[in-house]
């Protein structure tokens, strides 16, 4: 994989020599794009929100989508790795659900091409929600009378299917957008939205090469067609103390999905939006603080060491990516009638 190391180093040198232009910095749109076969409607969002918050579709009745992707927080659970049924823990850090509609693929390894596909995964995961399969989970949905009118309002008659449930959850997730951060206001022309330290951090972010991966409005790479995620090798430069300290070579990333050795240690480039709220960091959740994460990235991805001032400036800039969160209220879930959850 020496080719990728050389490519990254060349990209860094090229980027550091380029002037910064206002056109290189993009504000986050107010709405996430929706696919043609699943346009966002208020009815889908209402249904999807209920499904997202409902723990009854886990085998124990205790774990919902919101358990690991808490929209009352930064869209994750602030754990190194998420906790599922019976206190089981997974192997990766929970990505934020906020602004996930701007990602061309889902999961750290990009194994799902869309939010609709991703929504079907956790319910049948033995660690996360623990149902035997997605149809068993859907049978739970069908057994709750109050869900039928919600499905009919969103999709019409005889519409209580796995695919429609996934479409509804995805529609709700696409409303989870946090625009109008200080950074967004700055690039739109409000030049007092960032202070001088944040502006220095913004310039350092670009000049040292961070934008070779974290570009675009969501800071997760170039805009890609849905299903074609943007992946980078992590760590690119593995011969440093951080790699051992934080066990960064234990997870082979996308190679576990494709079976290709060339994909070893490649991961989806995550958004940096609201990153100050989503600790701990990286796919294994081993790094606790944002300043340490910045140092790790500089060394493992760019093979440079930032000084104290550069690190502090960049952290200040990254904190300026925290946007405005829409008000989220807990939904009133349809009542369970005539049955109870059989726990294992």
Predicted features along the sequence, with ranges:
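Bacterial N-terminal signal peptides that target proteins for export
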Residues: 1-8
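C-terminal capping alpha-helices of c-type cytochrome domains
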Residues: 134-179, 268-270, 276, 286-344
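Short glycine/threonine-rich turn/loop motifs
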Residues: 23-121, 184-295, 329-344
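Bacterial N-terminal signal peptides
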Residues: 8-17
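Short His/Asp/Glu-rich catalytic/ion-coordination signatures at enzyme active sites or charged loops
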Residues: 129, 147, 175-178, 182, ...
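Generic hydrophobic/packing signal
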Residues: 11, 101-104, 119-123, 145, ...
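A gly/proline- and charged-residue-enriched helix-loop-helix capping module
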Residues: 126-131, 140
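Sec/Tat signal peptide C-region and signal peptidase I cleavage site
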Residues: 18-22
């Amino acid at each position: 994989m020496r080719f990728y190391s050389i490519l990254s180093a060349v990209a860094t040198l090229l980027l550091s020599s380029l002037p910064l232009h206002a056109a290189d910095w993009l504000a986050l749109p107010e709405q996430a794009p929706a696919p043609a076969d699943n346009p966002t409607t208020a009815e889908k969002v209402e249904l999807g929100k209920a499904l997202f918050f409902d723990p009854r579709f886990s085998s124990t009745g205790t774990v919902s989508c919101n358990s690991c992707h808490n929209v009352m927080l930064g869209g994750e659970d602030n754990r190194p790795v998420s906790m599922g049924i019976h206190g089981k823990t997974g192997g990766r850090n929970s990505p934020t659900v906020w602004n996930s509609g701007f990602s061309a693929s889902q999961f750290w390894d990009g194994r799902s091409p869309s939010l609709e596909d991703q929504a079907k995964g956790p319910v049948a995961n033995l660690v996360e929600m623990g149902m035997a399969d997605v149809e068993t989970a859907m049978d739970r949905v069908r057994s709750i009378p109050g869900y039928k009118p919600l499905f009919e309002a969103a999709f019409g008659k005889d519409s209580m299917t796995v695919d429609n449930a996934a479409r509804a959850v995805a529609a709700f997730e696409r409303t989870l957008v946090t625009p109008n951060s200080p950074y967004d206001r700055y690039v739109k022309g409000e030049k007092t939205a960032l202070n001088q330290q944040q502006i220095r951090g913004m310039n350092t972010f670009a000049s040292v090469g961070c934008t070779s991966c974290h570009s675009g409005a969501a800071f997760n790479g170039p805009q890609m067609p849905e299903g074609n995620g943007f992946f980078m090798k992590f760590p690119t430069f593995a011969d440093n103390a951080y790699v051992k300290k934080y066990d960064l070579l234990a997870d082979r990333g996308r190679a576990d999905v494709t079976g290709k050795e060339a994909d070893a240690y490649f991961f989806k480039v995550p958004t940096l939006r609201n990153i100050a709220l989503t600790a701990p960091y990286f796919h294994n959740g081993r790094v606790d603080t944002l300043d340490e994460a910045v140092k790790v990235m500089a060394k493992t991805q760019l093979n440079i060491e930032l000084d104290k001032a550069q690190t502090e400036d960049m952290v200040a800039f990254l904190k300026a990516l925290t946007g405005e969160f829409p008000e989220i209220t807990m939904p009133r879930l349809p009542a369970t009638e005539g049955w109870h959850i059989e726990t294992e």
